Amino acid sequence: MDMTWLDLWKFHGAALLAGCVIDWIIGDPLWLPHPVRLMGTMIAGMEQRLRRWTEGTGRKGQSRAGAILAASMCMIWWCIPWAIVHAAELLWPAWAWAALLLAEGFLCSLMLAARGLYTESMKVCRSLEAGRTEEARYNVSMIVGRDTSVLDEGGIARAAVETVAENASDGVIAPFLFMAFLGPAGGTLYKAVNTMDSMVGYKNGRYLYFGRFAARLDDLLNLAPARLTGILMVLGAWVLPGMDGTHACKVFLRDRKRHASPNSAHGEAACAGALHLRLAGDAWYFGTLHKKPYIGDDDRKIEPADIRCANHLMFFAEGLMVLGLAVLIMVL
C-alpha cells in the first residue's frame, strides 16, 4: 500500500487505538503465549550462551556480553512485529487494510497491561473487602516481587496500590508512547528492554556489569514516560471524585525522586498525594530487608478501596493519551 508518512502514522495511530480497545475488552488471552514470556525465555537462553563465550574475561567481557544481549534483543523484537504485519498483508491481499489494522491492533493490545493490572489488583481488593486475608496475600504475591508473608491487610493493600501506580508507566503509558511514534515495533522494542532490565538489571555480583547496559537503556527509555505518567495522574486527581489534586501536585513535586531508580517513583508520588497515603518504605525481598524512603504523607489508614482508586488514576492517564492521539489523527 502506497501511503505518505503522515498517512502511515495515522494508520499506526488508528491501530494503536484499536489495540487499546482490545486490551480494555479482553486483556491478554490466557490461551495465547504472551510475547513477554518469549522475551524472557530468549533472554535467559542468550545469557547462558554469552556467559560461556565470555567466561574469564572479567568486567569488560561481562559488559560487552550485556551490550550484545541488549542489541540483539532490540533488533530481533524490532523486526518481529513488522514481519507479522507484512505476513498478514500477504496472506489476505484483498483485505490488506483490514488485515494490517487487525494484526497491528492485536499486537498493540499485547504490549498494553491496563486490563491485566486492573484484573489482578482488583482480585486483591475484592479479597480484602470480603475479609479473606490469606487469599488477598496470595493474589498480591502474583503481582509483586516482595515477600508478602509478613504483610498485614494494610501492607497487602499498599503493595497493590504501589504496583498499579508504578506499572501505570512501564505497563501502559510507556508502551503507548513508543507505539504512538514507532508503531507496534516501538512497543515490542520497549518491552524487550523493560524485560531485560527486570531480569538482568540488578546491582549484585552476578549482574552488576552484565546487566548494566540493559539497566541504563531502560532508564533512558523511561525518562519521558515516567514523568508524563506522574503528570497525567496529577491531572486525574483534579478531576476524579474523592481525590486531592492540590496535594497530588505537592507530593509529586516533592517525592518523585525518592527511589533508587530515576523513574520508579513518579506515578507512586502522584497516586500517594492524590489519596493522602504513605507508600513505599522498607520491604522484604528474598529474606533481606531493603531500606527505602517513604513516598507521600501518612494522613490516613490505607483501605482496600484505594486499590480501586489507583486503577481509576491509571485508566484516566491512559484515557488522556487515547484522547490526545485520537484528536491528532482527526486534525492532521
Could you describe each region identified by the protein language model?
Residues M1-L189, V193, G201-L332:
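Hydrophobic alpha-helical transmembrane segments
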